[in-house]
Regions:
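Aromatic-rich, lipid-facing transmembrane alpha helices and their immediate juxtamembrane interface loops
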Residues: 1-194
Length: 194
């Protein structure tokens, strides 16, 4: 859980900076209220696990090429499934690559898949080893307490954010139904007035 929350937080920070550069203002880019983007947590935990399954060569280090392809495929799959699921459940897109060439449903595109592959190499070869060294002195019982507290906060945030999104969807549905009724009335009036 520790890595999930840490990388979810780092991912949230990356998203906020990216949005700030594009929009020139600070925006919470996540679905959740708290400072975490779970898709980054899932992506990094999945990547760390996947890379750990690769047999080590004599050099004792997984090749950057292998990490690139594993990371590119894994993160693209997570982005596709996550984007599709979020849209189907909440009817909101948190990212949209529709304007990019060769995109698939606006959920994924090769340009970002290549960036995820490069990012995977950077994270596994540079960032993760530094963070692992920095967190190894933390006693297990402290880490367990931190994980439990973060998990409780995360579950509450997911529940509250989901309730808010579902409430918003209901409200938007009601507005759409009202719009449709107004359209029917407008069409009837147009017919009567000729």
């Amino acid at each position: 859980l520790y890595w999930f929350f840490l990388y979810g937080f780092i991912g949230w920070g990356v998203e906020v900076v990216y949005a700030a550069i594009k929009t020139h203002k600070l925006v919470n880019r996540g679905f959740l209220c708290g400072p975490i983007c779970p898709i980054y947590g899932f992506g990094m935990v999945g990547l760390i696990y996947s890379v750990s399954l690769i047999p080590m060569p004599d050099s004792g280090s997984t090749s950057a090429v292998a990490i690139f392809f594993i990371g590119m495929i894994l993160t693209t799959a997570i982005e596709l499934v996550g984007g599709w699921a979020l849209f189907k459940i909440y009817h909101i897109r948190w990212w949209d690559y529709s304007n990019m060439k060769f995109n698939l449903g606006g959920y994924i595109c090769p340009q970002f898949s290549l960036l995820w592959g490069l990012g995977s190499v950077l994270m596994i070869k540079v960032v993760h080893p530094l963070l692992a060294r920095g967190s190894s002195p933390m006693p297990f019982n402290i880490m367990l307490i931190v994980d439990v507290v973060l998990l409780v906060l995360f579950v509450v945030d997911v529940a509250a954010s989901t309730a808010a999104a579902i409430g918003l969807n209901k409200y938007l549905r009601e507005i759409d139904e009202l719009r449709a009724k107004l359209r029917v009335t407008s069409d009837k009036l147009t017919t009567v007035l000729g």
